[in-house]
Swiss-Prot record:
Name of protein: CDK5 regulatory subunit-associated protein 2
Organism: Macaca fascicularis
Chain positions covered by the region annotation Required for centrosomal attachment, Golgi localization and CALM1 interaction: 830-839
Positions of the UniProt region annotated as Interaction with NCKAP5L: 58-196
Coiled coil: none
Main function: Potential regulator of CDK5 activity via its interaction with CDK5R1. Negative regulator of centriole disengagement (licensing) which maintains centriole engagement and cohesion. Involved in regulation of mitotic spindle orientation. Plays a role in the spindle checkpoint activation by acting as a transcriptional regulator of both BUBR1 and MAD2 promoter. Together with EB1/MAPRE1, may promote microtubule polymerization, bundle formation, growth and dynamics at the plus ends. Regulates centrosomal maturation by recruitment of the gamma-tubulin ring complex (gTuRC) onto centrosomes.
Lineage top rank: taxon: Eukaryota
Annotated region (CM1 motif), positions in chain: 51-94
Self-association and partners: Homodimer. Interacts with CDK5R1 (p35 form). CDK5RAP1, CDK5RAP2 and CDK5RAP3 show competitive binding to CDK5R1. May form a complex with CDK5R1 and CDK5. Interacts with pericentrin/PCNT; the interaction is leading to centrosomal and Golgi localization of CDK5RAP2 and PCNT. Interacts with AKAP9; the interaction targets CDK5RAP2 and AKAP9 to Golgi apparatus. Interacts with MAPRE1; the interaction is direct and targets CDK5RAP2 and EB1/MAPRE1 to microtubule plus ends. Interacts with TUBG1; the interaction is leading to the centrosomal localization of CDK5RAP2 and TUBG1. Interacts with TUBGCP3.
Amino acid sequence: MMDSVLEEDVTLLGTLSGCSGLVPNVPDDLDGINPDARLGNGVLSNVSEETVSPTRARNMKDFENQITELKKENFNLKLRIYFLEERMQQEFHGPAEHIYKTNIELKVEVESLKRELQERERLLIRASKAVESLAEAGGSEIQRVKEDARKKVQQVEDLLTKRILLLEKDVKAAQAELEKAFAGTETEKALRLSLESKLSEMKKMHKGDLAMALVLDEKDRLIEELKLSLKSKEALIQCLKEEKSQMASPDENVSSGELRGLCAAPREEKERETEAAQMEHQKERNSFEERIQALEEDLREKEREIATEKKNSLKRDKAIQGLTMALKSKEKKVEELNSEIEKLSAAFAKAREALQKAQTQEFQGSENYEAALSGKEALLTELRSQNLTKSAENHRLRRSIKKITQELSDLQQERERLEKDLEEAHREKSRGDCTIRDLRNEVEKLRNEVNERKKAMENRYKNLLSESSKKLHNQEQVIKHLTERTNHKDMLLQKFNEKDLEVIQQNHYLMTAEDLELRSEGLITEKCPSQQSPGSKTIFSKEEKQSSDYQELIQVLKKEQDIYTHLVKSLQESDSINNLQAELNNIFALRKQLERDVLSYQNLRRTLEEQISEIRRREEESFSFYSDQTSYLSICLEENNRFQVEHFSQEELKKKVSDLIQLVKELYTDDQHLKKTIFDLSCMGFQGNGFPDRLVSTEQTEIMKDLSKGGCKNGYLRHTEPKILESDGAHTPGCLEEGVFINLLAPLFNEKATLLLESRPDLLKVVRELLLGHLCLAEQDVSGEHLGGKTEKTPKLHKKLFEQEKKLQNTMKLLQLSKRQEKVIFDQLVVTHKILRKARGNLELRPGGAHPGTCSPSRPGS
């Protein structure tokens, strides 16, 4: 059964996917069967893909390999079917009608699939052939046209070379014949010379009759030979003339035919090329037609030159004909001369007879003999003259022949030059075609690149604009939110300032003279550092960060708005890509400059902050040291000077107390004046700048805690401390430089710094100038609207910062100089404090001895 299946179905291809119920019972380890044989329809899927895409470039080898693989798989499937049938027969001994039906159906499916496969293979073969024919058609046609043109050009070149060789051979043969003719003429000259010599000898030998007879016989023989040679030369001349006439006529015909062929061949080739170019390249038609017209004009000019050369050749032929006519006339003359020679020969015969008669009649008459000799001499002279004329004519003929040969060589050279010009024109045409194709390809590539770049640039700008619009929208929302918050905080600050002013006015009315003493005591003994709590510091730092971030966001927004407005304007104006690139380069350069300026500004700010922090640290250390020293000195004075004060009299004590009261009043007035000025400056510098609600609440709580602790016995100082704190901790959210500058001036707003400033009005002026200059700088920074203006103001700001640094250094020097004065003031205050205490003790011991300058102790409620 297996043999029958193999013989019937050689290229069977089938799938058993339809009868999946039979597959699980099949063993995988059968003999002679590949376990990797697939029962799915993977092969058919590959075939279907190939039928779907018939234009795929595939060779016949690929198809043959695929067919062999299909045959192998078909064979494996047949074996598997055979073993399946045997296994089914072994397992099922009962009725097998269902199995037979399935087998028949499978065979039917296999045959149908086989037919489909054959049809698809045919389609694939046809498609591959069609693709190959289409791919090779264009190249084959171009190659065929090129080969035809090359063959025609080679044929024309071969014909021209053959004709040229034939002409050269003919010219060489004619030259050889002419040389032979010239050699014959030379021999004739030699013979004539020999005849003349012989005639001269005959004159000498007229003594002997026998010798004369022999000489006459020889002369007759020579004359006959000369006649024969003349006849042969005349025959040669006629043959040469006939050959020349024959050569001239076919040469003219050949040259005209060749020229016509040469003219017709390139015209036909050009017509074919123009037709092909019209079909393939319609746009190139104008350029090719212009070039063809130029070539046709060149060909016409060359045809005109050839026509002129033909006319010249005709003229030359006419000249040759004229020369032939002259030769004929000369031949006639030669015939006449021959007739004369015959007459002379007859005369010679008569002379012989006369000589014979003279021999017989030797002695009859010498006079007749001499007359005969004179007649012969006359004949010889005539023959000599005729020979000379013939030799001159021969020279003229040679010269004319040389001229004709030169003209023929010139014509051949001109013909070669024209052929070379034609070849060069063909080469230039081919080169021009190649260059035009290359240029077109380059132009197409450039257009594609330009279009791609334009698309990329448009997409990029669109993306940038969309992103920028989104960013602007988000940032505008943030700005609105922040402005609302700042307005709310400004309102709260204004309320807080109004409350502070009311409290200050109330405290002014509650002050009494008792508070003066307690205030002086508080100034000397107590240390009121007016330090802020860590919570307030953190809140201030957060607010500073928020304000700095807010300002940076505003600056970035302004920069981006300027950049994007400029970009939108440039895009709306629809300038060229070069302008856009130049603007982008300028923007990048400005950004780099801004980044450099920002870095330099940050470095300067860091250096200033470091210097300011060092100065603050030193000042705080110095103030703390001075306070410790004053407290220590006060203790020492209390212990050591107790006995010295007891020795004072009542009048001295009264004077010292009155002086101290006046000094304290002056200090108090100066202190109030200084605090008012500082408060005014703080209000001027920080008016309109909001604080957060948390900061206000924390400040209020801290102030209440300080009041509850009772750090200072002076009520005025209790109410003024929040203002000092306010002036210390107030930072404008406009810029970070103001915060740094106010942190630098914070130590000056402490109580100990106020005492120093009271004693030094020049320091007050310097502080005022610094504050006013810093405020002007802040206003100038805020007033900058666009990026270009800020870039121009950066060097000015650097200069102003440098000037402020110098001023700060000067103030630090002044502060260092004022340390000594502080020591003196503190010593004086300690001394006055001790004196006041002793005086108070002495007065209290006396009954009813109250001094008018003294006051009752302070109330706890104040």
